[in-house]
Design a protein with these regions (language model features):
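FIC/Doc superfamily catalytic core
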Residues: 1-274, 278-437
């Protein structure tokens, strides 16, 4: 990934070309182009390649664009840094959708698949753990990783260990979402995320103790994108991070925007030798759940980040190279959340259909409950696959005995077969095929 070009100093440009730039502000065609660029929130590195009306120098357009933005900026000071951001109209729309989703329609839609609620939380946590690990270099496929998590298999390599760590840490987040964040909790989460994956085990759950860490291109190490602050500043920065996360003393910041700021700050502080990205995304989840946005339990945001990982990286670099303008990072992350929400809605529609089919199955088969009907549908979808109790237990979020009793009940009714393979019992669809498809 090529590092974006840093914009020229707008004050210097304005000083040199004041009269030419001022004239352009009276040109409606030019201003229409400027407004379009602002709506898209283009960075200088994008603007300089755009076709500009009347071949006007891009530097002139950039000055007008920056003046327009600066009039709308909100300031945010952290440590010795001053960040700023603009609440674009598009932000307000997306945040409203998320607020309404948490309060109303989407919630009732999820409740309509109540028997699958826990199941979907488990599935989304798996998806998030897999994708978040893939962003950091884990090499595996989703089906293999999901099977490992469902069967609770022991991880065989570095990539699988990353995924197991991520999944277990997200489960931990669900149990501690009411807590206030502290430096010790951040270290605890980092230790959980990085267990048995670091070159030097002593860095699990500890802040870095050197300045050798840089953010660089994984294929071209000499291409450094960003140099984090001195390691000696980390304890005080993390203390300030926790104060910012836990306090509402500042001017109001929408919780989702603030959660994204926390995500960004961990990447910016880079407090750890490794695992900064996974820790940042985990803390984002903690924060929005802590603020009552339970909807995020059902969204695998990192799966969207994986689809556009270059844009994810650029959202950091655009912010850094444009005077710490957080709008780039916020805009990208809100777009990924919107896409994750769309994925969730698609899932709910599919699950409502499957649940309806399961209810029809109950009518035709009798003697089974809704969960058992859904288990049967799972067997029908994977007619050649053999399932073990642990897998059903994980998929449906039930206790071991409940999963075992469901499978034995379906076997007694003749819908499944129980087979012993290498001292372990497995279940498969009955060859009698007496279940209506």
């Amino acid at each position: 990934m090529k590092k974006p070009q840093k914009p020229k100093d707008t004050k210097e440009l304005l000083k040199k070309h004041h009269s030419e730039i001022f004239k352009l502000t009276k040109d409606e065609k030019v201003m229409e182009f400027v407004r379009k660029c602002n709506k898209e929130y283009v960075h200088w590195d994008q603007l300089r390649y755009k076709k500009i009306p009347n071949d006007i120098p891009p530097e002139y357009i950039w000055v007008i664009l920056k003046l327009l933005r600066e009039s709308q900026y909100k300031l945010f000071t952290f440590g010795s840094w001053t960040f700023h951001y603009e609440l674009l109209d598009d932000f307000q729309k997306k945040l409203h959708i998320l607020d309404m989703g948490t309060a109303g329609r989407i919630g009732s839609n999820i409740d309509s698949i109540a028997s699958g609620r826990e199941r979907y939380i488990i599935s989304s946590l798996m998806e998030e753990a897999i994708a978040s690990s893939q962003l950091e270099g884990a090499v595996t496929t989703r089906p293999i990783a999901k099977e490992m998590l469902r069967l609770k298999k022991k991880p065989r390599n570095y990539s699988e260990q990353m995924i197991v760590n991520g999944y277990q840490t997200l489960q931990k987040i669900l149990t501690m979402k009411e807590k206030t964040i502290t430096p010790d909790i951040i270290l605890e989460l980092h230790k959980s995320i990085t267990k048995d994956t670091l070159k030097d085990k002593k860095y699990e759950g500890t802040f870095r103790d050197n300045n050798e860490v840089v953010v660089a291109d994984p294929l071209e190490i000499e291409k450094v994108y960003y140099t984090p602050p001195d390691y000696k500043k980390i304890p005080s920065l993390i203390k300030e991070f926790c104060e910012f996360a836990n306090s509402d003393k500042h001017d109001f910041i929408h919780p989702i925007i603030k959660g994204m700021m926390l995500h960004f700050l961990i990447g910016y502080i880079h407090p750890f030798e490794d695992g900064n990205g996974r820790t940042a995304r985990t803390l984002f989840y903690w924060y929005v759940l802590n603020k009552g946005y339970w909807l995020f339990e059902f969204m695998a945001i990192s799966r969207i980040l994986v689809r556009s990982r270059i844009k994810y990286g650029l959202s950091y670099l655009y912010t850094e190279t444009d005077d710490n303008d957080l709008t780039y990072f916020l805009e990208y992350n809100l777009s990924t959340i919107e896409e994750a929400l769309e994925d969730m809605n698609t899932y709910i529609i599919r699950k409502q259909k499957e649940q309806s089919e399961a209810l029809e199955l109950i009518k035709s088969l009798k003697n089974i409950n809704l969960r058992q009907a859904e288990i049967l549908k799972e067997f029908l979808k994977n007619s050649e696959k053999m399932f073990v109790v642990n897998e059903i237990m994980t998929i449906y979020g039930v206790a071991y005995d409940t999963a075992r009793n469901d499978l034995l009940h379906l076997t007694q009714l003749g819908y499944l077969e129980k087979i012993k393979i290498q001292k372990k019992f497995v279940f498969k669809l009955s060859k009698k095929r007496i279940i209506p498809e």
